[in-house]
């Protein structure tokens, strides 16, 4: 991740934290999503919400999935939101990875506005390098290859 992308990813995480600080726990995923879009609008960052991704099986259309928030220019990133009582799971990571591959984006982030009394906001930054997925630690810069292919 280059220095500009790193700076922008950190700014994005600060937006997630601001939303968590103001709204607290007990909201739906949609409410958190709407609040994030307010943060993006205030900064003039272009995005789309609920962008559809068609799914094909053996050349036949079988359905679609929806990408929560997609940033296109400021930082090409897919944002997948959760509001659950559990930690971010590998299937959440693989969900955003499939979206990243579809969009041909190198950056993704899964954000969980954790509803558990003992947990707060959690997030995982995902990078694709040579189509291999990694979890990126913003604080240390460490890359950990995601090898749990159980999804």
State where each predicted segment sits.
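Interdomain/boundary linker segments immediately adjacent to catalytic/signaling cores
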Residues: 1-25
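Nucleic-acid nuclease catalytic cores
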Residues: 82-138
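Active-site metal-binding core of divalent-cation-utilizing nuclease and nuclease-like domains
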Residues: 28-76, 117-125, 143-148
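Non-catalytic C-terminal interaction segments of nucleic acid-processing enzymes
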Residues: 1-3, 135-151
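Conserved beta3 VAIK motif of the Hanks protein kinase fold
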Residues: 79
């Amino acid at each position: 991740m280059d220095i500009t992308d790193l700076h922008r990813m950190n700014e994005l995480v600060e937006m997630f934290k601001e939303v968590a600080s103001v709204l607290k726990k007990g909201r739906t995923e949609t409410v958190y999503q709407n609040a994030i879009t307010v943060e993006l609008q205030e900064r003039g960052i272009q995005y789309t919400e609920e962008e559809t991704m068609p799914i094909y099986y053996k050349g036949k259309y079988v359905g679609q999935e929806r990408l929560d928030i997609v940033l296109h220019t400021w930082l090409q990133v897919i944002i997948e939101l959760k509001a659950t009582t559990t930690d971010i799971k590998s299937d959440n990571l693989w969900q955003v990875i499939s979206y990243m591959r579809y969009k041909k984006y190198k950056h993704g982030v899964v954000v969980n506005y954790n509803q558990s009394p003992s947990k707060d906001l959690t997030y995982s930054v995902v990078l694709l390098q040579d189509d291999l997925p990694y979890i990126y630690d913003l604080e240390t810069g460490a890359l950990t290859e995601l090898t749990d292919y159980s999804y």
